[in-house]
Regions:
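Bacterial N-terminal signal peptides
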Residues: 7-17
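Short hydrophobic alpha-helices and adjacent helix-cap/hinge residues
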Residues: 2, 20-253
């Protein structure tokens, strides 16, 4: 994906200018990352973006902004994103690059017009909204959908004696989309595992005590496998049940 992603950026800048001569222009690029500056791999993403543009012969000033998603409410995220867009507008930004679902989702739902006026390149989108892409011809990039059929199958094969799969979520839009994807996958493969069942637990809709009792204590956790379609702060607890997820953010907890 990395081999394809950064040539795509160079191509977009070439289309914008009609030529790709670094001596003629320096482009202003806004890179919006979904989580905090302290997330371990974020500096690597910024470095790779810089290297990719440099290899493509593009001279660019890259400004990296951090949304700090999962810490703020969605309304607060939108406020932060509007501030990010206003700063980008003042810098006369030529291109926006986003990393992961939260950055792109908030960018397109914050109410600012900037993402509709200049090219946007997305990366790491696990739950793409095709309707958004259809009405935004200025958006391009790559998605990285999770194959939950494979993830669920691996979870059951690794822990065959654990018969209860718990899909853990909160009430956020992306988390609920992840739950739907897990449920659809389970419908496809559950006939292979007739002794297993999948149940959904929402940490914002159900008593935390009951959830903690189910998956955090040895005397109950032995029969559970936790499926986390989207990483949530609750999962930073010391769970006794194994957790299967597809987000790099899980590796920081």
């Amino acid at each position: 994906m990395k081999r394809l992603f950064f040539p795509l950026l160079a191509g977009l800048l070439w289309l914008m200018s009609g030529t790709l001569s670094a001596t003629e222009r320096t482009y202003n690029v806004l890179f919006i990352q979904s989580y905090t500056k302290n997330t371990p791999w974020h500096s690597l993403l910024t470095e790779n973006l810089e290297n990719g543009l440099d290899k493509g012969g593009v001279k660019a000033n890259i400004t990296t902004e951090y949304l700090n998603a999962d810490y703020w409410s969605f309304a607060s995220e939108c406020f932060i994103m509007r501030r990010i867009c206003e700063r980008a507008r003042q810098r006369k930004t030529d291109l926006i690059v986003t990393s992961s679902d939260e950055a792109f989702f908030t960018l397109t739902h914050c109410g600012d017009s900037l993402p509709y006026q200049i090219p946007v390149v997305v990366s790491g989108i696990k739950y793409p909204d095709e309707r958004v892409f259809e009405r935004m011809p200025n958006v391009s990039g790559y998605v990285s959908k999770t194959d939950f059929d494979v993830l669920l199958d691996a979870a059951v094969r690794m822990f065959p004696s654990r018969r209860e799969l718990v899909c853990l979520s909160d009430s956020s839009f992306l988390s609920l989309k992840g739950v739907k994807a897990v449920e659809e996958s389970w419908e496809r493969i559950k006939s292979n595992y007739p002794e297993h069942e999948l149940k959904v637990l929402n940490v914002q809709a159900k008593s935390l005590n009951s959830i903690i009792t189910s998956i955090c204590y040895d005397y109950n956790a032995y029969k559970h496998i936790v499926i986390a379609p989207k990483w949530i702060p609750f999962l930073s607890l010391k769970l006794k049940a194994p957790v299967f997820t597809s987000q790099n953010l899980a590796m920081t907890n």
